[in-house]
């Protein structure tokens, strides 16, 4: 299939590995609608505060590669892959502001995609910061 799986974890430099892949012209796919650990960034998502990972937005900011939000939505004929408009993370006076604005754009994109059928979206991890 041509898929390379990169497993992250403590002691591994996953960010640099992914950065190198992007710079060399490879596409990467990252789970971006939830932070699987508690180090995410708070962002408004469906009128609640959720924890999103900063990594995808930080990679885009560092490499200049756009983010293309996607979602798999179940239809009567099977699953359909939907692409939202690609976007570049905006440059602001500091990285934290750029990351926050990029995450807001990402969360808005996911809201539009998931609103096609919110019943298809699920998580077994806490998403909303109020759940922590």
Predicted regions, residues:
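Membrane-interfacial amphipathic helices and adjacent loop/beta segments
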Residues: 1-11
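Non-catalytic C-terminal accessory region of glycerolipid acyltransferases
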Residues: 12-132
């Amino acid at each position: 299939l041509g898929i390379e799986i990169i497993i992250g974890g403590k002691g591994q430099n996953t960010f640099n590995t992914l950065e190198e892949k992007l710079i060399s012209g490879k596409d990467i796919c990252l789970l971006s609608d939830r932070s699987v650990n508690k180090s995410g960034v708070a962002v408004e998502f469906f009128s609640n505060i959720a924890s999103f990972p900063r990594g995808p937005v930080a990679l885009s900011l560092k490499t200049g590669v756009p983010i293309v939000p996607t979602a798999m939505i179940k239809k009567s004929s099977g699953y359909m892959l939907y692409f939202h408009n690609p976007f570049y993370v905006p440059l602001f006076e500091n990285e934290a502001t750029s990351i926050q604005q990029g995450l807001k754009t990402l969360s808005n994109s996911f809201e539009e995609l998931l609103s096609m059928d919110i019943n298809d979206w699920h998580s077994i991890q806490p998403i909303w910061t109020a759940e922590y």
